[in-house]
Amino acid sequence: MANINKTVKLGVFTLAIMNVTAVVSLRGLPAEAVYGLSSAFYYLFAAIVFLIPTSLVAAELAAMFQDKQGGVFRWVGEAYGKRLGFLAIWVQWIESTIWYPTVLTFGAVSIAFIGMDHPEDMLLANNKYYTLAIVLIIYWLATFISLKGLSWVGKVAKIGGMVGTIIPAALLIILGIVYLATGGHSNMDFHSNFFPDFSKFDNLVLAASIFLFYAGMEMGGIHVKDVDNPSKNYPKAVFIGALITVVIFVLGTFALGIIIPEKDINLTQSLLVGFDNYFKYIHASWLSPIIAIALAFGVLAGVLTWVAGPSKGIFAVGKAGYLPPFFQKTNKIGVQKNILYIQGCLLYTSPSPRDGLLSR
């Protein structure tokens, strides 16, 4: 039993999907849809100057240190010393811990929209106690799956990434194409400027948010020792993931902007509303609860990827002697159980995430 977790290997496709689920969150599409055609400029610009260079560096460092575990802790530590390596993995871990409530709130909204009564669904989605309960349930479910080891994490992340992110994104894009091809009215002006006006502060804010959208492609480096032939397969997985990410963001944003008027875009609920509008157009409203369930599953997969990733890097820090023995404890299959438990407690006990949820 002790060696089960160590013998599991990730294939190119599984790691690519894990990278996509770590980076892509469909909940962010409404925020960019309000900027129309110029949103594509931001996506492509950020991909060229941030996503692709980050992916190249991650692929190179993962291949260089394929026999050493730790991800950014190892990469930064080898170049600048273990103290800065610890700082790098700590920042990655703590920012993901604070980020969980944001993405999990979208999961709660998705579950609320499983019903067919949209006024009631919206009322439930805005209930802060319902949201808090769902956030904690999804997060701890992800934690317990992580405790089952990399085999479970890989399978759930791959299936969840396909069912909850890639397939819904592809469906959204196809629905947008069908809508336009059959004479549907586009709420997005495709004759507007592709290049944004940088004299407006709002456009600078959007540029910053797009860079944040692409954060996380390096996180897969944590699992480099768990990849078959990492020097060859890890770079493949990174670039496949990067390509899928850009396509989903650009075309998905367009599809959402086409079906929802700019004035009606809501950052939390518009993705579900967009699907609802498309389904009504093709007379298939019965698909709305199904897509809501799929999106909630996608949230679980995305959170699972981050729960299992940076915590493993913190575990590598502990094994290097920079944390007390308590942080080095594992379960019988070698999973960093104490770090996962502490991470879960921080989600609720930290004032920022908890107060943010209860103040909705």
Regions found by a protein language model. Name each.
Residues 1-60, 65-69:
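Membrane-interface "cap" regions at the ends of multi-pass membrane proteins
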Residues 2-4, 77, 104-133, 167, ...:
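Helix-loop-helix connectors at the membrane interface of multi-pass transporters/channels
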Residues 9-27, 46-47, 135-138, 195-259, ...:
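Hydrophobic, membrane-embedded alpha-helices of multi-pass small-molecule transporters
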Residues 30-41, 115-128, 150-162, 290, ...:
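Transmembrane helix-loop boundary segments of multi-pass membrane transporters
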Residues 34, 52-139, 143-147, 296-316, ...:
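Hydrophobic transmembrane alpha-helices that form the core helical bundles
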Residues 74-75, 81, 113-120, 239-304, ...:
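TM-loop-TM module centered on a large, flexible mid-protein loop between adjacent transmembrane helices
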Residues 114, 163-194, 253-260:
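Hydrophobic alpha-helical segments and their helix-loop junctions in multi-pass secondary transporters
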Residues 131-183, 215, 238-243, 360:
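Membrane-interface loop-to-helix entry segments
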